A protein has these predicted regions:
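Short amphipathic beta-strand segments in non-cytosolic proteins
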Residues: 82-99
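Short beta-strand/loop motifs in extracellular/secreted proteins, especially
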Residues: 80-82, 118
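Extended hydrophobic-aromatic, low-complexity segments
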Residues: 75-77, 94-96, 111, 120-121
């Protein structure tokens, strides 16, 4: 084993460590059997929900998403620019372009430019401090990263 996961309070001389990260990832893939039914939230810390029938998306269609963090709509603030990305190996060729949509009132949307498999992502960074929501992690890590992902296919 080359690496082991340990909380800061179990590391000798942890004062030399600049950052310790806890990573929480949530992923969903959507498809329909016979017909699309609107999915229900699963209660993830970072929840991405499609507001569009993802079983029948074609090039040029708009797809809409609802994003919540800790049960509340996740949005841009005056301090942060929150956004959702969309990527596909069929868009951008070797340059690997991505689409970006700002999260406003917990909503994001994209007009799909190419057919193929697409992945949308949202990342959230929360610093750990004694006065914050993550105070139980003080001494164990410095930052918590949340990742939410949805994959779906776009038809020609």
């Amino acid at each position: 084993m080359k690496m082991a996961v340990k909380p800061l309070d179990e590391v000798k001389d942890a004062s030399k460590i600049l950052a310790a990260i806890k990573y929480k990832s949530f992923a969903k893939a959507f498809f329909a059997v016979k017909k699309w039914t609107d999915p229900k939230p699963l209660g993830f810390d970072l929840e991405l929900m499609p507001l569009t029938d993802l079983s029948n998306v074609h090039v040029g269609d708009m797809v809409h998403f609802d994003v919540s963090f800790m049960g509340k709509p996740f949005s841009c603030t005056q301090d942060t620019i929150q956004y959702m990305t969309a990527t596909s190996n069929t868009f951008g060729g070797p340059d690997n372009f991505s689409l970006y949509s700002y999260l406003i009132n917990g909503k994001a949307q994209f007009r799909m430019p190419s057919a193929g498999q697409w992945v949308v992502n949202v990342y959230v960074r929360q610093d750990v401090n004694p006065d914050g929501k993550l105070k139980e992690l003080v001494g164990k890590c410095t930052t918590v990263w949340y990742a939410g992902t949805i994959s779906f296919n776009v038809k020609p």
